[in-house]
A protein has these predicted regions:
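Conserved polar/disulfide-associated segments of primarily extracytoplasmic proteins
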Residues: 58-152, 157, 161
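N-terminal targeting sequences that direct proteins away from the cytosol to non-cytosolic compartments
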Residues: 2-75, 116, 132-136, 146-147, ...
């Protein structure tokens, strides 16, 4: 009887120790990793990205680089576009045109918008939800103009995944530098 009580007591102490040590399981909620790799673009910018995000450099089109999040949804990514602009184009004129374009998306709902900086340059940032390509997505877009080029960073994800990767996306945006 004493032996059985001792075994039960030791078992209870072990279970309590494991529970008290803070062992948890993170099922279904991935822990985003910090941006550690650097992408150096021939289009005049650098940006850091996490090693578990897939980098894609399209051979043509507006997107200079696209980083896919480690989710199964191909629409979830952060991408950088670089557009040549005339010398007389300003951030405010591009902002008016860009906002008009995104407001045309189906089910557009603005969450926040305002002036900010990107790579140390005056910029504009907007966060919104909209239906794009048949998918309801949440977006953050930030853009600036420098040396006759417009740099646009777009982070987009399913609204249920958006906040999970938002801090990583913001770290990537904060790492963006124009050469």
């Amino acid at each position: 009887l004493i032996k059985r009580t001792a075994i039960l007591l030791i078992g209870a102490v072990l279970i309590i120790s494991v529970l008290a040590s803070g062992c948890t399981f993170n099922v279904g909620n991935p822990t985003p990793s910090a941006p550690t790799n650097t992408y150096d673009s021939a289009k005049g910018f650098t940006i850091k990205y996490p090693s578990d995000w897939t980098k894609d450099v399209p051979k043509s089109g507006a997107i200079s680089v696209l980083f896919r999040m480690p989710t199964k949804n191909a629409e979830e990514n952060l991408n950088v576009q670089v557009w040549n602009r005339s010398a007389n184009e300003t951030l405010s004129s591009r902002t008016a045109l860009t906002l008009a374009a995104v407001q045309d998306f189906s089910n557009y709902t603005e969450i926040s918008a305002g002036n900010t900086t990107l790579g140390g340059n005056p910029a504009y940032k907007v966060t919104y939800t909209a239906t794009y390509g048949g998918d309801h997505l949440k977006f953050t877009q930030i853009w600036t103009i420098k040396h006759g080029k417009e740099y646009i960073i777009t982070y987009k994800a399913d609204p249920k995944n958006f906040d999970t990767y938002a801090s990583t996306a913001q770290q990537m945006i904060d790492s963006f530098k124009i050469k």
